[in-house]
Amino acid sequence: MELASGTTLVAPQPKGILDPATGKPIGSNDAFFGEINNELADKGFLVTSTDELINWARTGSLMWMTFGLACCAVEMMQMSMPRYDAERFGFAPRASPRQSDVMIVAGTLTNKMAPALRKVYDQMPEPRYVISMGSCANGGGYYHYSYSVVRGCDRVVPVDIYVPGCPPTAEALLYGVLLLQKKIRRTGTIER
């Protein structure tokens, strides 16, 4: 996050039960906490809620695991190469599901591969997110009417972001990653 020079960081307004006499949250006029807050403000500290700090850390260090099943995986690999450099957004690849926050399902999901997808998804720690990449992962795509194809990976795992295209470009996938980061910032650490 880049700030213009000379701007002041301000913590969000405190939430809580409002005092009917003053219209401010209870405890906001407490002299002890007011003094501590003023001392910290003079020394250059930032006071914020833990929830916002955790969300900031989660969006800046997303580790993704590939589940490349078809040609979309080539575009997924291209996204992590120097031209697009997904790591500048804090989105780095990992090979193990136990170290991953995000799974990118790229390509045609067959009926035989569906249990493996679910098993890998179950091995990921909470909170975990899924990006469905391409027409085949979104809804079966070109092979929609085949007997052996799952018509969308959302029938096997919950999907957070859908990236359309056949295959979607690396820019489209990068935009999906940015949308996922925005979604994580909007939701709290407890709820999903």
UniProtKB/Swiss-Prot annotation:
GO BP, one annotated term: electron transport coupled proton transport
UniProt entry keywords in alphabetical sequence: 4Fe-4S, Cell inner membrane, Cell membrane, Iron, Iron-sulfur, Membrane, Metal-binding, NAD, Quinone, Translocase, Transport, Ubiquinone
PROSITE patterns named among the record's database cross-references: COMPLEX1_20K
Catalytic activity: a quinone + NADH + 5 H(+)(in) = a quinol + NAD(+) + 4 H(+)(out)
Localization, UniProt: Cell inner membrane
EC number annotated for this UniProt entry: 7.1.1.-
Entry's Gene Ontology cellular component terms: plasma membrane; respiratory chain complex I
Named cofactor requirement(s): [4Fe-4S] cluster
Class in the EC hierarchy, top level: translocase
Cofactor: binding comment: Binds 1 [4Fe-4S] cluster.
InterPro entries assigned: NADH_UbQ_OxRdtase-like_20kDa, NADH_UQ_OxRdtase_20Kd_su
Gene Ontology molecular-function annotations: 4 iron, 4 sulfur cluster binding; iron ion binding; NADH dehydrogenase (ubiquinone) activity; NADH:ubiquinone reductase (non-electrogenic) activity; quinone binding
Ribosomal protein is among the record's keywords: no
List of residues binding [4Fe-4S] cluster: 71-72, 136, 166
Membrane topology of this protein: Peripheral membrane protein
Pfam families on file: Oxidored_q6
HAMAP family per the UniProt record, alphabetical: NDH1_NuoB (MF_01356)
Function: NDH-1 shuttles electrons from NADH, via FMN and iron-sulfur (Fe-S) centers, to quinones in the respiratory chain. The immediate electron acceptor for the enzyme in this species is believed to be ubiquinone. Couples the redox reaction to proton translocation (for every two electrons transferred, four hydrogen ions are translocated across the cytoplasmic membrane), and thus conserves the redox energy in a proton gradient.
Family to which this protein belongs: Belongs to the complex I 20 kDa subunit family.
Quaternary context: NDH-1 is composed of 14 different subunits. Subunits NuoB, C, D, E, F, and G constitute the peripheral sector of the complex.
Protein name: NADH-quinone oxidoreductase subunit B 1
